Amino acid sequence: MTLVRLSAAALTIALAAPLTFLGARAQQDTNSANYIMLGCEAFLLDPIPTSKLLVAGVCAGIIDTLQAIKPNICLPGISTRRLLVRGVVTYINNNPARLHENFIDLAGEALEQTWPCAKQ
């Protein structure tokens, strides 16, 4: 009976070992600029690739929300969602060492730096 248990334990370990490697791989941070920038860059394409539609919508939605709630962003009279996304993409691409940072924080900073309000 002991031999059967040892064999079963060895088989379980042998079968589970490859799963450990899958779990050990680093999870991708879906809140990082590195991840969401894929959607922002896809948003600027015409048409947006089907495989990137969801993350492109996430990017545009975050940027729309930020420009609506941040009081220190002063957009030009005529501004489009594409213009806002392009501004954020340009800012983040000019700061590649920060791609690991939270996209919302970085996009908010990008909007404030790209379209600051005049000081009173």
Residue ranges of model-derived segments:
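Compact alpha-helical subdomains of small soluble proteins
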Residues: 66-120
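Short N-proximal segments of mature Sec-exported proteins
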Residues: 27-90
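Sec/Tat signal peptide C-region and signal peptidase I cleavage site
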Residues: 20-28
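Bacterial N-terminal signal peptides
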Residues: 10-20
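Bacterial N-terminal signal peptides that target proteins for export
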Residues: 1-11
